[in-house]
Amino acid sequence: MCIRDSYKTLEGARFYDASLKLYEGLSAELGFNLLFSQQGHLTLAHTDRAMFVMTERAEVNRLAGIDSRVIAPDEIQRLAPSMSMTPDAVYPVIGALYHPPGGIIRHDAVVWGLARGADARGAEIHPHSEVAAISRANGRATGVTLRDGRKVGAGHVVSATAGWSSTIAEMAGVGLPITTHILQAFVTEALKPLLDVVVVSSQMHVYISQTDRGEFLIGAEIEPWTTYRQQGTLNFLQESSRHTLELFPQLERARVLRSWAGLCDISPEFSPILGATEVEGFSISAGWGTYGFKAAPIVGRTLAELIATGSTPALIEPFALERFYRDRLVSELGAAAVSH
């Protein structure tokens, strides 16, 4: 899973930067190796327009104190010597936004580590327990009812349910401006080390990294249609493979091990919806699209502060649901070259 904080708005950049800093110390805090490798992140530019966008993002990042800069092809080649830089390619690489603190982390290790830490601190985890309803009394959320009929009371209910965010929020009487799409990815067989930086291309709609086990992890953009059906498509495999081979032709004979599709909840301007709602005792962490994993630590910390104090932390104030009614949007549309 890719981790970075090179976003295009000051609100977003500062928020994700706080999360990245928490990730840097999370292995030690949890006593669990999360396999976090800050190997760097390259967002490729293939046109003059793309170079302008990269320069703009680099300036926003600089204002937020984030290490992010535009680099030329010779430095790109030094960072990714195995990548094809042929000038007569369909999409020639003319520059890139280089973000040194970015990198990859094992998502399953993060989940296991956080679950173990939560359990050690007295939290109860109920896997495979579907929520069927949110209980309310006098306009306040008071708990949840599970599909098997069990009721769980709570002083505060938080929905952090990704693709099902709008469905869960409706149970509490809250409408969210969210659509649900699928995001696909696949991995190859393990290969010798070829790439130690994350490579992303917006025009090719592909992102590529190599795991510590040698597998190449390859993904693309969210699919344009709305669905809850988590089924991959042949077109994704064909197009992603084609563009990957334009950058790394040496992968021509690599075998695909597995592919998958997950659900993403997308807000109108690709920024999250965070914090309290008009229903007392019901808060949300929604609208993450493809960015949510990067923000997990800081979301947990800020929502815990909101629940404990009743006040919204300044870091998440810009992402309140009410911004859509006040025309105070925080547009991160295009902040990811592709969905990662």
Residue ranges of predicted features:
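Active-site substrate-recognition segment that forms the wall
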Residues: G31-G40, A133-S135, R140-A141, K151-E280, ...
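Helical element adjacent to the flavin cofactor pocket in flavoenzyme catalytic cores
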Residues: A96-H156
